[in-house]
């Protein structure tokens, strides 16, 4: 019997924060594998513009390449309509009846569990794992395993914004992902811009160093 961690998301784009979070849960719970689950159409983002599935999948492949226990499950990309976790987990359980599934969520999602589609049935199929973050409560009426992880203040929206502004994203995403974004012109990228240290980057680094001078 395998212990499988499921990490769902749009991964638009995937970044080192995703990988760090997945690896911490893998180690803390001694899981067999982590399956990254790219969404086709997340219910909470139905009105947002999301990068094409094939681009997000390719970036995710580049991000997890080389980690022997990181894999990608494309079940939601292959299914039409909103990507409800209940439908996905029910299908995975049917396909892999001898495995145990652990669904990984950030602390910011824990308080929303009561609003998840068919949550009372879902908790009978999967164990939720919440990764702690400062400023977010882990209180919920549903069972959640809490996992500590180092804080890495990066988000997909931040990366998209930096690319649009012509700022570097080196060391925020795996190198293969950075090059793919540049090659495909995703998020408004222009060739060569994502790799150049700009005046804005240097100013941001100086500001960060100043804020952290007494506590970092």
Curated annotation (Swiss-Prot):
HAMAP family for this protein: NaMN_adenylyltr
Q: What is its EC number?
A: 2.7.7.18
Coiled coil (UniProt feature): none
- Which processes are annotated in GO (biological process)? NAD biosynthetic process
This protein's name = Probable nicotinate-nucleotide adenylyltransferase
Family classification: Belongs to the NadD family.
Top-level taxonomic group: Bacteria
Entry GO MF terms: ATP binding; nicotinate-nucleotide adenylyltransferase activity
Q: Which InterPro entries match?
A: Cyt_trans-like, NadD/NMNAT, Rossmann-like_a/b/a_fold
Pathways per UniProt: Cofactor biosynthesis; NAD(+) biosynthesis; deamido-NAD(+) from nicotinate D-ribonucleotide: step 1/1
Q: State the organism named in the record.
A: Geobacillus kaustophilus (strain HTA426)
A Pfam family (short name) is CTP_transf_like
Spell out the reaction equation it catalyses.
nicotinate beta-D-ribonucleotide + ATP + H(+) = deamido-NAD(+) + diphosphate
Keyword rRNA processing assigned:
no
Keywords assigned by UniProt?
ATP-binding, NAD, Nucleotide-binding, Nucleotidyltransferase, Pyridine nucleotide biosynthesis, Transferase
Gene3D superfamilies this protein is in?
HUPs
Asked if the Swiss-Prot or TrEMBL record annotates the protein with the keyword Nucleotidyltransferase, the reply is: yes
Q: What does this protein do?
A: Catalyzes the reversible adenylation of nicotinate mononucleotide (NaMN) to nicotinic acid adenine dinucleotide (NaAD).
């Amino acid at each position: 019997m395998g212990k499988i961690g499921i990490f769902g998301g749009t991964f638009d784009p995937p970044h080192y924060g995703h990988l760090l979070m997945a690896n911490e849960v893998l180690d803390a719970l001694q899981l067999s594998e982590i399956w990254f689950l790219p969404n086709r159409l997340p219910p909470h983002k139905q009105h947002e513009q999301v990068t094409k599935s094939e681009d997000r999948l390719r970036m995710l492949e580049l991000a997890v390449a080389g980690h022997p226990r990181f894999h990608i499950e494309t079940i939601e990309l292959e299914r039409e309509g909103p990507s409800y976790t209940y439908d996905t987990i029910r299908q995975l359980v049917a396909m892999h009846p001898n495995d145990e599934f652990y669904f990984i969520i950030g602390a910011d999602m824990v308080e929303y569990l009561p609003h998840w589609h068919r949550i009372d049935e879902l908790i009978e199929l999967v164990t939720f794992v919440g990764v702690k973050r400062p400023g977010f409560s882990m209180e919920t009426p549903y069972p959640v395993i809490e996992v500590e992880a180092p804080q890495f203040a990066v988000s997909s929206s931040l990366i998209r914004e930096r690319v649009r502004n012509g700022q570097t994203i080196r060391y925020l995403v795996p190198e293969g992902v950075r090059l793919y974004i540049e090659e495909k012109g995703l998020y408004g990228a222009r060739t060569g811009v994502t790799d150049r240290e700009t005046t804005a980057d240097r100013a941001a680094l100086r500001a960060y160093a100043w804020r952290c001078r007494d506590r970092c």
